[in-house]
Amino acid sequence: MVDIVNEYDLVVDDEARMRKLIKDFLVAKGYSILEAEDGEKALDVFEQNAGKIRLIILDVMMPKLDGWSVLRQIRQTSQVPIIMLTARGEEQDELFGFELGVDEYISKPFS
C-alpha cells in the first residue's frame, strides 16, 4: 500500500469504462483518485485541487476540450507529470505531445 496523504492522481477520459479500469487499478495499489469526463471538467478539478495532484492520466481525444488543450493550459502553471492516453499511435502525435510537455504515452487499448 502506498501512504500518500492529501495527494491525488487525476484520471481524465470521456469513456467511463476506461476511467473505471484505471481507477480500480490505482486504488488497489493505494492511490487516491479524482476523475473527470472531459477537458473542461479536468481543468476545474485541477484548479480546485491545486498542489494536491501528483499525476495526471489524460486522454487525447475528448469532447468539449481535447487533451492537447488541457495539457497546454496546465503547462502554463504546473509541471505535474502527465501521461497521455491515445488510440492514435502515430509518431508525429507523440512528438507533438512531447513538444507540449507530456511526460509519457500509453496507447489504447492496453492490457
What are these regions (language model features)?
Residues 1-10:
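Non-catalytic signal-transmission and effector/linker regions of two-component phosphorelay proteins
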Residues 20-28:
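Charged docking surfaces used in two-component/phosphorelay signaling
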Residues 35-55:
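Acidic, metal-coordinating helix/loop segments flanking the phosphotransfer/catalytic sites
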Residues 38-41, 66-69, 93:
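Acidic catalytic/metal-coordinating carboxylates
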Residues 44-47, 68-79:
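Short amphipathic alpha-helix used as the core "switch/output" element in two-component signaling
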Residues 59, 86:
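Active-site residues of response regulator receiver
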Residues 62:
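Receiver (REC) domain active-site loop signature in two-component systems and cognate sites
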